[in-house]
Amino acid sequence: MSESEIFGKVKDIVAEQLSVDADKVTPEASFQNDLDADSLDVVEMVMALEEEFDIEIPDEAAEEILTVQAAVDFIAGKVKA
């Protein structure tokens, strides 16, 4: 799966989970600062990403995933592994 395919799926999930317009979900968008996610939103989003990509995102890693691109990079590393 290419990084652009991963971004497309992440973008869809983030837009749905956070109830934001998909156009706002850019690689550099911060979940909390730009997309107004609270801590519960982030937990639910991480769970949705884990399910979609059939991966596990440890709590320590989830705390470091602050932007859409960080999520894409983490998932790309797991999917290719």
Curated annotation (Swiss-Prot):
Pfam families registered for this protein in UniProt: PP-binding
Domain named Carrier: residues: 4-79
Residue intervals passing through the bilayer: none
Post-translational modification: 4'-phosphopantetheine is transferred from CoA to a specific serine of apo-ACP by AcpS. This modification is essential for activity because fatty acids are bound in thioester linkage to the sulfhydryl of the prosthetic group.
Keyword Transmembrane: no
Localization (cell): Cytoplasm
Alphabetized InterPro entries for the sequence: ACP (IPR003231), ACP-like_sf (IPR036736), PP-bd_ACP (IPR009081)
Keywords: Cytoplasm, Fatty acid biosynthesis, Fatty acid metabolism, Lipid biosynthesis, Lipid metabolism, Phosphopantetheine, Phosphoprotein
Function comment: Carrier of the growing fatty acid chain in fatty acid biosynthesis.
Name of this chain's protein: Acyl carrier protein
Species of provenance: Acaryochloris marina (strain MBIC 11017)
